[in-house]
């Protein structure tokens, strides 16, 4: 059964309960944006890996083909994306 937005949010919220999470995409290709203070002392690659690791089985099986991760602290998110 293909993953949906709620599946992604639920899994990420299990690791980062205080995160602001948004998901775009469908079927087997998604982009997630995760904003949490937990990322404050983590490097960008560490942040992305912490989320991607949650979906290793789905990526390996092909159930999830593409997962793009944008992981920011609240301060980074507040600087504006423009």
Summary of predicted features, one role per range:
Residues 2-82:
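N-terminal, polar/charged subdomain of small-to-medium soluble alpha/beta proteins
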């Amino acid at each position: 059964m293909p993953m949906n937005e709620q599946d992604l949010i639920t899994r990420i919220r299990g690791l980062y309960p205080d995160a602001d999470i948004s998901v775009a995409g469908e079927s087997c290709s998604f982009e997630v944006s995760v904003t949490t203070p937990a990322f404050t002392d983590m490097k960008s690659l560490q942040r992305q890996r912490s989320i991607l690791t949650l979906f290793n089985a789905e990526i390996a099986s092909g159930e999830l083909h593409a997962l793009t991760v944008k992981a920011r602290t609240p301060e980074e998110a507040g600087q504006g994306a423009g």
